Amino acid sequence: EDVDHVFLRF
């Protein structure tokens, strides 16, 4: 899971 990465994308 890359949940923390999704937030960085925004």
Swiss-Prot record:
The keyword Secreted applies. The modification Phenylalanine amide is found at F10. One of its GO terms (cellular component) is extracellular region. Disulfide bonds: none annotated. Signal peptide: none annotated. The keyword Secreted applies. Expressed by the venom gland. GO terms for molecular function: ion channel regulator activity; toxin activity. Transmembrane segments: none annotated. Is either amidated (Sa112) or non-amidated (Sa12b). It is found in: Secreted. May be directly involved in a paralyzing effect, by inhibiting muscle contraction, or may also act centrally to modulate prey behaviors. The non-amidated form (Sa12b) potently inhibits ASIC current in rat DRG neurons (IC(50)=81 nM) when preincubated before activation by acidic pH. Has no consistent action on the time course of desensitization or the sustained component of the current. Has no activity when coapplied with acidic pH, suggesting that the peptide needs to interact with the channel during its closed state. The amidated form (Sa112) inhibits both the frequency and amplitude of spontaneous contractions of the locust oviducts (tested at 50 nM). Belongs to the FARP (FMRFamide related peptide) family. This is FMRFamide-like peptide Sa12b.
